[in-house]
């Protein structure tokens, strides 16, 4: 058998080329004898190999340090050549670092500005309102009752005033529709009777009227569907406010079977979609309770204010008034009528209205009191003439000069 082998010089040439390509150091083999000698140093290899060791000489007593040679694996070898992509990456990183340093340097550099001297002259206005010194903290004694949320109550009422602007009803919103303001007043008067017969909460009635007005403002209907909208709105308000809401069959009965259960359910879906399932508009009662607490009024003044507020839900010309200003005007007029109490700074602070701001609404309320004596829409007046409501609609003070002076 013939064996084919490469020469040593051929193997050496290939190894040198590979070493140059990979950038590793080449070590010469002992078996290579035909390597050319360097003229400047002579044949170092022969001199080393021809050296003789004298056994009579002792070796120096120096410690022998052996250098551990770690052989590189294919995973630890790295190329010494740098590609163009690596250079571009290094340049980008350098640019980013430089830019970040510039931004950081600008951020920490102090801004030098001139500071004006404080004017401490006596003719300048105070830095705080002196009015707050006379305002009583009506929530100071409620901190031990977590249900009264005294820490958040001011923020809650601030948010409620924002909501009443969000869900506001425009004045004369029925203009151009088949349903008129008079038809609306008749419907609300009838719903007051239904509400009283079902023994529902006071909030349910106010929410019913709110749903009706908001729905009719954006969804015109025919007059033969107006009563359907009314009973469906009361059904929705009952589900929202009551613990035990009346059934659909109860509203079918109260309308003398003018509408079916399917009609009420269909209208319920229409109202929900139109109002986007939003029934969070604040009510007059919410603000009245807060104002009555701030004014420390008795039950008679509070009940008279409720009567005045309920007169406004029938009046079409007052649909655009916010619940907060109606509640403030009703309580202020109640205080004026019963004992001529003053609208204090505490009441102005917590109601967010001064007496001057609510005066036009007080005039309108006085007109409604006079109008209720001769109006055919008597549901509210009859309701508040019962002993349950202290017969407040029949008190002689409602015919006093405090009312008549505001009407003129």
Swiss-Prot record:
GO molecular function, a single term: cyclin-dependent protein serine/threonine kinase regulator activity
Gene3D superfamilies referenced in this protein's UniProt entry, alphabetically: Cyclin-like (1.10.472.10)
UniProt cross-references to InterPro entries, sorted A to Z: Cyclin, Cyclin-like_dom, Cyclin-like_sf, Cyclin_A/B-like, Cyclin_C-dom, Cyclin_N, Cyclins_cyclin-box
SUPFAM superfamilies the UniProt entry points to: Cyclin-like
Domain of life according to the entry: Eukaryota
Matching Pfam families: Cyclin_C (PF02984), Cyclin_N (PF00134)
Subunit structure and binding partners: Interacts with the CDC2 protein kinase to form a serine/threonine kinase holoenzyme complex also known as maturation promoting factor (MPF). The cyclin subunit imparts substrate specificity to the complex.
Protein name: G2/mitotic-specific cyclin-B
Organism in which the protein naturally occurs: Patella vulgata (Common limpet)
């Amino acid at each position: 058998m013939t064996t084919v082998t490469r020469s040593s010089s051929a193997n050496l040439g290939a190894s040198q080329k590979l070493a140059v390509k990979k950038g590793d150091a080449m070590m010469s083999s002992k078996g290579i004898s035909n390597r050319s000698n360097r003229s400047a140093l002579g044949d170092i290899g022969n001199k080393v190999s021809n050296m003789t060791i004298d056994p009579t000489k002792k070796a120096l007593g120096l410690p022998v340090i052996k250098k551990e040679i770690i052989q590189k694996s294919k995973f630890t070898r790295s190329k010494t050549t740098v590609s163009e992509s690596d250079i571009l990456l290094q340049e980008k990183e350098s640019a980013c670092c430089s830019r970040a340093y510039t931004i950081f340097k600008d951020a920490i550099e102090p801004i030098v500005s001139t500071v004006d001297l404080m004017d401490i002259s006596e003719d300048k206005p105070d830095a705080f309102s002196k009015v707050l010194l006379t305002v009583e903290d009506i929530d100071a004694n409620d901190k031990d009752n977590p249900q009264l949320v005294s820490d958040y109550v001011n923020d809650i009422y601030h948010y409620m005033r924002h909501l009443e602007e969000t869900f506001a009803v425009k004045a004369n919103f029925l203009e151009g529709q088949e349903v008129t303001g008079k038809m609306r007043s008749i419907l609300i008067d009838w719903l007051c009777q239904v509400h009283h017969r079902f023994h529902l909460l006071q909030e349910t009635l106010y929410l019913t009227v709110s749903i009706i007005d908001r729905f009719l403002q954006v969804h015109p209907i025919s007059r033969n569907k107006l009563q359907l909208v009314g009973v469906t709105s009361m059904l929705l308000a009952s589900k929202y406010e009551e613990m035990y809401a009346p059934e659909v069959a109860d509203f079918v009965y109260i309308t003398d079977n003018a509408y079916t259960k399917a009609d009420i359910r269909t209208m319920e879906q229409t109202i929900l979609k139109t109002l986007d399932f939003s029934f969070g508009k604040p009510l007059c009662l919410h603000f009245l309770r807060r104002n009555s607490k701030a004014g420390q009024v008795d039950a008679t003044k509070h009940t008279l204010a409720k009567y005045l507020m309920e007169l406004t839900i029938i009046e079409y010309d007052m649909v655009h008034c916010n619940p907060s200003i109606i509640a403030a005007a009703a309580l202020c007029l109640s205080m004026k009528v019963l004992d001529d109490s003053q609208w204090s700074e505490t009441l102005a602070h917590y109601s967010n209205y001064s007496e001057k701001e609510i005066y036009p609404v007080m005039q309108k309320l006085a007109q409604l009191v006079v109008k209720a004596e001769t109006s055919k829409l008597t549901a509210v007046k009859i309701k508040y003439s019962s002993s349950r409501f202290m017969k407040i609609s029949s008190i002689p003070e409602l015919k006093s000069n405090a009312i008549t002076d505001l009407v003129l």
